[in-house]
Regions:
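Helix-turn-helix
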Residues: 31, 35, 39-73, 77
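Solvent-exposed, amphipathic alpha-helical segments
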Residues: 35-42, 85-96, 175-182
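Amphipathic alpha-helical linker/stalk segments
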Residues: 81-105, 137-152
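Short secondary-structure transition hinges
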Residues: 107, 114-152, 185, 190
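Amphipathic alpha-helical packing segments from all-alpha helical-bundle domains
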Residues: 134-159, 166-170, 195-207
Length: 214
């Protein structure tokens, strides 16, 4: 009987450890991603070395390799958090907006610029596809739906299919991206002599969608 009790206790302990291991792994994986999110917000993309992320997370410099096969995989997981944040902000402004498609798209574009200027490090990482594995870790699942929202709004504002809405949306996105970058670098405020980005936002929308009735 004592031997049987000992075996039972040992088996129970092993099962408990096995159950704890996936939870612990998930926790450490999440901690590495969170460390990267904090690091990119504070110091920018250039700070996201494996060693620095590990130091920020309080783990050994070799620990990230246990959870992310490559550096790009870890950067992609960090960028996914950025896309999720942008998606949440977008949903918040659109869900409570019953205005016209043009008004909704204006709110979407404004949210995009606000995100770019308030989170410059994360914003840069999200679109640095030379640093990311976009076909892994669900990155496309979080990034492409955002673009589709833009395409759908463009299609409602501009029913013409020549060029198709996806092309117009792509050109509009590229223009907004350029405005965000040049504004963040200080080039556009200097060139325009203004500290108000709103006129540039509206001019960008007018250029791709036609003038808005005012």
């Amino acid at each position: 009987m004592p031997a049987s009790t000992s075996t039972s206790t040992s088996t129970s302990s092993s099962a408990h450890s096995a159950n704890e291991e996936p939870t612990q792994d998930a926790g450490l994986r999440a901690r590495l991603v969170e460390a990267g999110v904090e690091l990119v917000a504070r110091e920018g993309v250039q700070a996201l070395s494996l060693r620095e992320i590990a130091r920020q997370a309080g783990v050994s410099h070799g620990a990230p390799r246990r959870y992310f096969p490559t550096h790009l995989d870890l950067l992609s997981a960090i960028a996914r958090r950025g896309f999720a944040d942008l998606a949440a902000r977008t949903a918040e402004v659109l869900d409570g907006n019953d205005g016209s498609p043009r008004a909704r798209l204006t709110s979407l574009a404004r949210t995009y610029l606000d995100f770019a200027l308030s989170e410059p490090g994360m914003y840069e990482l999200m679109f640095r596809h030379d640093l990311l594995e976009s076909n892994r870790l669900g990155l496309r699942d979080t990034s492409l739906p955002l673009f589709q929202v833009l395409v759908d709004l463009v299609a409602r504002i501009r029913p013409s299919t020549d060029p198709p809405p996806s092309v117009v949306a792509g050109a509009l996105w590229g223009n907004l991206h350029g405005v965000a970058q040049l504004w963040g670098w200080g080039s556009l405020p200097l060139a325009t002599g203004s500290d108000d980005i709103e006129p540039l936002l509206r001019a960008t929308l007018d250029a791709h969608l036609g003038p808005e009735a005012r």
